[in-house]
């Protein structure tokens, strides 16, 4: 309503006087990047690149979505264009020991096609045969090592195993954001033996947006948090409450907040053990002067199914036996108006059960609104998980400033945690003042 708009406008005016710094200005997170390395640093050097090539494969070993492979290409291209010898490492799936269906062999044709050269494939990731292939690599060549998780030592971050991996190369590039929150041999252990250890372009972009833009946003800064459970998003909400001006909540978690406020929620999803927490988060938002918006109306259903009967009711009027599965049209309008005032938005988690067409309107409306404000110059960040699927489904992914490729890694960064795979990298050179 009007009071909300006035509240936001008064905040906006108070920010106009503040200076804006460039995104990379977050000193604590500035890492040396592969872009800082020139041909003088790279020509003839063996570079161990840990990428995240964990792509989905069908039963015939065909790649069903090559997004992660495409995302790894800029870093590899920069290295080969500067005469490096690239030793590429990744995991795929969660193999228990050597498991042929988790081999990286099916990735070779697509990698070769995207790089415009024949990628050589090793049948192992350490040992004499691999060492021989490394010795034969020409400048600008690429060797793909076998799935690093075929060794249980990888996830144990075994120092002997890390040393064997590191012995293949002269320097290290981590471009695997999706596993940066894990201290494994190929993400953290190898950095103890290889200097410099630097961030790849993909990892760098994730840090620039999820840490840089969130720590030092163009304001007003809004966070949209959805998803079915408060429990999985507590850390994110608590961390973002410290930084954002507007917090919009949607998805199944809202019913825990409603119940905490004494409203009846019918048979909607509620986490009974999180009611006190919901109350304290509402109080914290008030104390911090954050405009926390909960949906004022919801789309309810008589069962959890695509063909359920549905109707729109005020949030305070959910009858027994009905469950809320999406935010309603009034909420979409209020949320959209709030987003129109913003300069930076981060979105993590859908507004409703968008897999069912009947309950997808809220999520789709948010995606379209983000496309609209993005085109007007706002910074829009999709913080991993189901929100990524949502913007892709609506066809607005191209318009977003940044779409995070991480699941757990994105959440941990948004929770304000340090990631082991990032901490292990060399600091950026001090910028001359």
Curated annotation (Swiss-Prot):
Enzyme Commission number(s): 2.7.2.3
Presequence positions on this chain: 1-28
Necessary cofactors: Mg(2+)
Reactions listed under catalytic activity: (2R)-3-phosphoglycerate + ATP = (2R)-3-phospho-glyceroyl phosphate + ADP
Domain of life, source organism: Eukaryota
Sequence positions that bind Mg(2+): 386
Name by which UniProt lists this protein: Phosphoglycerate kinase, chloroplastic
Protein source organism: Spinacia oleracea
């Amino acid at each position: 309503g009007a009071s909300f708009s006035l509240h936001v406008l008064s905040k906006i005016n108070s920010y106009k006087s503040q200076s804006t710094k460039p995104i990379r200005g977050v000193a604590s997170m500035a890492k040396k990047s592969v872009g800082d390395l020139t041909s003088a640093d790279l020509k003839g050097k063996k570079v161990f690149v840990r990428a995240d090539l964990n792509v989905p494969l069908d039963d015939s070993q065909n790649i069903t979505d090559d997004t992660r492979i495409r995302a790894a290409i800029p870093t590899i291209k920069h290295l080969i264009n500067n005469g490096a010898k690239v030793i590429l490492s990744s995991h795929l799936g969660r193999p228990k020991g050597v498991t042929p269906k988790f081999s990286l062999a099916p990735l070779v044709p697509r990698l070769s096609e995207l790089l415009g050269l024949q990628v050589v494939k090793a049948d192992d990731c350490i040992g004499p045969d691999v060492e021989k292939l490394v010795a034969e690599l020409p400048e600008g060549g690429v060797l793909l090592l076998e799935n690093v998780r075929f060794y249980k030592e990888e996830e144990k971050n075994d120092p002997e195993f890390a040393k064997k991996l590191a012995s293949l190369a002269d320097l290290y590039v981590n471009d695997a954001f999706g596993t940066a929150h894990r201290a494994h041999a190929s993400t953290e252990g190898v950095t103890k033996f290889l200097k410099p250890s630097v961030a790849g372009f993909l990892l760098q972009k994730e840090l620039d947006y999820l840490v840089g833009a969130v720590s030092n946003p163009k304001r007003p800064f809004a966070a949209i948090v959805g998803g079915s459970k408060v429990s999985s998003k507590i850390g994110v909400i608590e961390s973002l409450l410290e930084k954002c001006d507007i917090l919009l909540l949607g998805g199944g978690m809202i019913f825990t907040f409603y119940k905490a406020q004494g409203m009846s929620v019918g048979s909607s999803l509620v986490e009974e053990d999180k009611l006190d927490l919901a109350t304290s988060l509402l109080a914290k938002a008030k104390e911090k002067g954050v405009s926390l918006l909960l949906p004022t109306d919801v789309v309810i259903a008589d069962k959890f199914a695509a063909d359920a009967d549905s109707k729109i009711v005020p949030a305070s009027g959910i009858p027994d036996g009905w469950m809320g599965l999406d935010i309603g049209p009034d909420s979409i309008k209020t949320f959209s108006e709030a987003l129109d005032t913003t300069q930076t938005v981060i979105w993590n988690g859908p507004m409703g059960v968008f897999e069912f067409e009947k309950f997808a309107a809220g999520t789709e409306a948010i995606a379209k609104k983000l496309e609209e404000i993005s085109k007007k110059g706002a910074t829009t960040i999709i913080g991993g998980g189901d929100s990524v699927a949502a913007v892709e489904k609506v066809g607005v992914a191209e318009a977003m400033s940044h779409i995070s490729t991480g699941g757990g890694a994105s959440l941990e960064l948004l929770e304000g945690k340090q990631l082991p795979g990032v901490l292990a990298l060399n600091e950026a050179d001090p910028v001359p003042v």
